[in-house]
Curated annotation (Swiss-Prot):
The keyword Glycoprotein does not apply. HAMAP family: Phe_tRNA_synth_alpha1. This is Phenylalanine--tRNA ligase alpha subunit. The keyword Translocase does not apply. PROSITE patterns: AA_TRNA_LIGASE_II. Belongs to the class-II aminoacyl-tRNA synthetase family. Phe-tRNA synthetase alpha subunit type 1 subfamily. Its EC number is 6.1.1.20. It comes from Gluconacetobacter diazotrophicus (strain ATCC 49037 / DSM 5601 / CCUG 37298 / CIP 103539 / LMG 7603 / PAl5). NCBIfam families: pheS.
Amino acid sequence: MSDDLETLRQETLAALAAATDRREWDAVRVGTLGKSGRLTALLKELGRMTPEARKLRGAAVNRLRDDLTREIEARGAEIESAILNARLAAERVDVTLPVRPESSGAIHPISRTMEEMAAIFGAMGFKVAEGPDIETDWHNFSALNTPDHHPARTDQDTFYLPAREGTSQERVLRTQTSGVQIRTMLGEEPPIRIIAPGRTYRADHDATHSPMFHQCEGLVIDRGITLAHLKGCLTDFLRAYFGNPDLPVRFRASYFPFTEPSMEVDIGWSRKSGEIGGGDDWLEVLGSGMVHPRVLANCGLDPREWQGFAFGMGIERLTMLRHGIPDLRSFYESDVRWLRHYGASPLSPALLHEGL
């Protein structure tokens, strides 16, 4: 081998030995075997030689190219192995260290209450229905026999939104989930048996009221429905929810524009101790009544053929009563300590309906 080829071999091997990372290794590879590399330049010179000289010189250059290619590839593999070993050493896990304690989340008490309501009413044959949070004035008020002068329709109680472009129909953030009942009666044939849990909105904010809160309404439409069905349904629900088969339940006359007759539902309660089911006091928990004939007619149902009852309750209120939560605002303060205390385990399903 001529002196220049031996010099190229020694210099390349020395550069490879000095390379410690991919960048330095790649610089040696390109400088030797690349398009402008030193070995490539020697191959280009072969074209200017005589056939006899080209044969001898070409054989020597090709042997050198093969040798250097093997050396470069071998050094590249060594560098990759060293990089991998360094990364594995940095990521090494000490298996003798103690295991980190596991922590689990909790289901928000409002979510759990809605699950329990769905479970209890589901055992009675109800299904869950949903509807939009933004309702038309007609679905939220007019179809429910709410007169134009009713205080609930004022902007002090209701959040009004601009009408859709090209229409004059007013829109509101729904003040109740009753609009779901209207949409169900318009879209389905009786018999109907639904509950409609969801968010509702009213312009009110204090320790017991929130601008956004959750409500669950229910509706039953069928032939021959009477007050006895309403009382039996709600009594069974309240006793199952509060876990007291002997819970005192009282129905007293009231007024709602969409039901006739209308009734408030109270449960036995001790004002002194706050115990549900104990004492001589009564605590109002929900409203109910027989669906007003005008509401049935507004939804295309003949009141002489179809009857029904409806009810509505605040989900936060029932949750506060059962868990002894004093302030409604704490539901939305995102306090992890509070949630750990009042939240439910995600591994514990809502099976209260088994007590019915």
